Amino acid sequence: MSSDNTPSINRRNNENPPQSSLPTTSGIVYNMFPACPYPHVQNPAFHGSVDVPQVAQKAFDPQAATVSESANVSRPTPAPVPPAGNTNTPTTSNSNQNLENNVTSAASMPAILNAAGQLEFSPSTNNALCCCTTVHGHPHMPPNLLAASSARLRLPPISTILGGTFADPTFLAAAAAAAVPHYAHATTGSATDASNTSNGNSNPAAVPAGFLSGYSPLSYAYFVAKANELALANQRQSSEAAEQPSSKNNTSGANPPSSNNQEVTSAPIPAAPIVLPFQQPFYPIVCPGCAQGALPQHIPVPHNTEFAQYQPSSRDLQNHPTVDESRLSSVAPPASNTLNHANGNQAENASESSTSQSNDSQGPANTSYPVSVPLPNDAENNHTLSRNPYIPSLNFKDNMSAELSVVATLASNSAQAHPMGQQSDSNYSDHHNNDKRAHVSRRHSTSRKIAQSHTGSSSTSSAANVRYRCTECLQGFSRPSSLKIHTYSHTGERPFVCDYAGCGKAFNVRSNMRRHQRIHGL
């Protein structure tokens, strides 16, 4: 096979890597990864087995024997062959081999289409599996499918990816992206492939043998991986058919097809654009170790096909929120009848005056509208102030801006719907200003009463409680301490002096002096 436009893999043993052709799909170009920092293994054992019903077993593995529905489907795998020049690859013992025979299911075996259009599994395939699948629990995704800002983010939980099905569109794209074959860490064109070819084993596609063992055959990730694998095998067959004269002279540079490919008809399949049935993922599925130094070169654009359907994301739902009719009805303008509008303004004025009389301790801003009035929605611009993600939340103590916006909206809606109601609006504004003046005067009178009580006024006390009277002004007091403090106002005495160095401030009440000394830290 020709290798003019194919990049190479920098292996750990610093050997000259073989070159292989990589698929170029519609909108997606697969590039090579940097060397994986972790050691590679051959056919790792996945703990646990896959339960496959009998119907699904017959559909995926026609060669399997009849098994009960509750039995675990297991297929034996051959002993792994270490790559050439890699001395760090662990050898598989008898116990490890038995473990692999128990846990490797038919779902982990690559498949191709035969002449009848049925899936055929190749149990003899023995490819290298990237260690990141076993260390991190996640298959790889090419970094060029991710944005530059999200290439170094953490991975989602493996249970989240494995649980992605057609019924869960949120995790559907993540599971699909996780099932993309890892083209960089597959051993192609090495001495290992030559030995596998002589033994009847081959490497028809750069997809690891145990790549799908962590997925259920009925999951969406399994379907996507199978679709990508078939597309890659299809392209390899078309490229081999086009380069058949040159491959006779140089057979070591191309990977021969697997044993199952011999049953496929020799007619070359025309190359067609491959549309991968997944979009740009919601979650970045990439190994942090293999993503170092790798920048995306091409981001896929979803095609308008039956597989790439648009799924609304959470950001789209925030930008286009649903309209709450109850909130709209609470701030809707009054009816079109002029008489009802005038009566509504009178009732509103009465409620405002009663609110201002009952809440004397509150500020004048709280008497205009209650704080619980929701913000209005502009139906013409499809804009919601309270739900705009780019505007900070208005749920703070000072709701003056929210109240003013409500007042302005109600006034504008009333003016547009009722041109004859301008006089009532002006009357309402005059009445509101009068209420504010009266409220300020009441607060001023209350402050005067409080000041008089601090100076020793006994106007609020009854005559029965008066036991002591001032000889100067004849004011009555119930306690002698109050009379003594009052006497200082006539004599001008300040017997309590701050003893802090350099201060010397005098007070007529001891508690006031102690409160002052807190400033000095005493």
UniProtKB/Swiss-Prot annotation:
This is Zinc finger protein C25B8.19c. Gene3D superfamilies: Classic Zinc Finger. Residues 84-96, 345-362, 453-462 have a biased composition (Low complexity). The lineage of its organism: Eukaryota, Fungi, Dikarya, Ascomycota, Taphrinomycotina. It comes from Schizosaccharomyces pombe (strain 972 / ATCC 24843). One of its GO terms (biological process) is intracellular zinc ion homeostasis. It is found in: Nucleus. Its main location: nucleus. Residues 1-25, 61-96, 235-265, 311-386, 413-462 are annotated as: Disordered. InterPro entries: Znf_C2H2_sf, Znf_C2H2_type. One of its GO terms (cellular component) is nucleus. A zinc finger (C2H2-type) spans 468-495, 496-522. Residues 311-321, 335-344, 413-427 have a biased composition (Polar residues). The keyword Transport does not apply. One of its GO terms (molecular function) is RNA polymerase II cis-regulatory region sequence-specific DNA binding. Residues 428-438 have a biased composition (Basic and acidic residues). Keywords: DNA-binding, Metal-binding, Nucleus, Repeat, Zinc, Zinc-finger. It holds the Pfam family zf-C2H2. PANTHER family: FINGER DOMAIN PROTEIN, PUTATIVE (AFU_ORTHOLOGUE AFUA_4G10380)-RELATED, TRANSCRIPTIONAL REPRESSOR PROTEIN YY. PROSITE patterns: ZINC_FINGER_C2H2_1, ZINC_FINGER_C2H2_2.
